[in-house]
UniProtKB/Swiss-Prot annotation:
Belongs to the Casparian strip membrane proteins (CASP) family. Keywords: Cell membrane, Membrane, Transmembrane, Transmembrane helix. Residues 1-121, 183-198, 268-270 are cytoplasmic. It comes from Arabidopsis thaliana (Mouse-ear cress). GO terms for cellular component: plasma membrane. This is CASP-like protein 4A1. The chain crosses the membrane at residues 122-142, 162-182, 199-221, 247-267. Residues 100-110 have a biased composition (Low complexity).
Length: 270
């Protein structure tokens, strides 16, 4: 009897243990599943810019702690950009640095090159006229010595000496400028607009034009005064011829100064 009671108690204990194990098994399974979910690596899914993004928030009904619901997203705007190579950047920088248009032979139009060539030839013609008139003027003035019944000479009057000196200076300057223009026309070289050539040429042409004008005026006044005092003679006639040629030199230098002034104002190489 005692053994039967012991066996019955033992069987009851086994049944109780089995029931406890059966009750604890679903809890352990749920805990293990939760731990496995947390241990998995989190992966992010990139959504297109127009589709709504997804965010995880806990469900209010408590069905699962990781319920995924859509949320609206803000569209991203990208600023457009342009890829340029090094050559284009250099061209852009050079065009920004360049403040004045270039008047080189490659960029000039046929009309501009023809106009520049015409001005060169006209300037050369005026230089030749000034050169010849100055040469003849001071030659006639130098030859006016011991002429007429009075045997008077030009070096006795400062007005005639002044006219002689002005024509000599104009003769030398015109000779140098003629050589320069002939060289430019023969080699077809355009002058640089960055040097002081145009400023010097315009300034010297103006100075010589005013110098010849004042010298010719003073010499002509002296000739009229001599003739009013002593009458007509060979000496004042030669002096008058020299003064007339000096006026021609003044007109030639005036036109040369106009051409050089155009080159200075237009900043072109002629």
């Amino acid at each position: 009897m005692e053994e039967l009671e012991k066996t019955q108690k033992f069987q009851k204990k086994k049944k109780q243990q089995q029931e406890k194990q059966d009750q604890s098994s679903p809890i352990n399974f749920e805990m293990s599943s939760r731990s496995s979910l947390h241990s998995l690596p989190q992966t992010t899914i990139e959504s297109p810019p127009d589709s709504p993004t997804l965010s995880s928030i806990p469900d209010s009904h408590g069905s699962s702690p990781h319920t995924i619901i859509p949320t609206p997203s803000v569209a991203k705007t990208e600023t457009p950009f342009r890829v340029t190579n090094g050559e284009e950047e250099k061209k852009v920088s050079e065009s920004r640095r360049q403040l004045r248009p270039s008047f080189s032979s490659s960029s000039s139009t046929p009309r501009e090159s023809k106009w520049a060539s015409l001005i060169r030839k006209a300037l050369l013609g005026f230089r030749v006229i000034a050169f010849v008139s100055c040469l003849v003027s001071f030659s006639v003035m130098v030859s006016d010595r011991d002429k007429g019944w009075a045997h008077d000479s030009f070096y006795n009057y400062k007005e005639f000496r002044f006219c002689l000196a002005a024509n000599v200076i104009g003769f030398v300057y015109s000779g140098f400028m003629i050589c320069d223009l002939v060289y430019l026309l023969s080699t077809s070289i355009r002058r640089s607009r960055h040097n002081l050539r145009h400023f010097l040429e315009f300034g010297l042409d103006q100075m010589l034009a005013y110098l010849l004008a004042s010298a010719s005026t003073s010499a002509s006044i002296r000739v009229d005064d001599w003739q009013s005092n002593w009458g007509a003679d060979k000496f004042p006639d030669l002096a008058r011829a020299s003064v007339a040629l000096s006026y021609v030199s003044f007109v030639a230098f005036a036109f040369c100064s106009l051409a050089s002034g155009y080159a200075l104002c237009a900043l072109r190489s002629i």
